[in-house]
Amino acid sequence: TLTNESILLEYYMDVLGNESAEALDLAFLNSFYHSGVRNPIDNALLACQTMPGREAHFGELLAQYRKTDEIPFDYARKVVSTLVTAADGSSKLILKGDVAHVVARCGTVAYRGQVLPMEEDTAQSVSAVVSEMLQDGMKVIAVAQKEMGTADHITSADEQNLTLVGY
């Protein structure tokens, strides 16, 4: 929501509009670790770490993952990717940005603990959820992820066949 030239995080949700802590966590990690210019959306996401009762959670999240690599935002791609690595050495690519550009890079969706193929009816459901939010005047960004094994570097070729997590 745009208020007094600042953006407030109103919702963080899965692909069908249900509240999703996973979508928030991934978007937060992406915003925290990317080194490009911070925009009002990044600032709104980063403000979550000071939410009452959530400070410890975001502190633990940052302790669990470290940044390994990134592909900065650019206006052609309309997304930013970060590669984070957990203490066990496993890496994941987190992609955040314009809904259409994120969805176009996804082959699957995460929903209620399952990873499902991005089929035509799924894509239509995603579009309907996003359209409703846009009609309500919201700025919507999407977040997706991809397990990367023990990778320590990413390229734009890695930004394909991701799993859409939410908005």
What are these model-derived regions, one by one?
Residues T1-Y167:
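Conserved cytosolic headpiece of P-type ATPases
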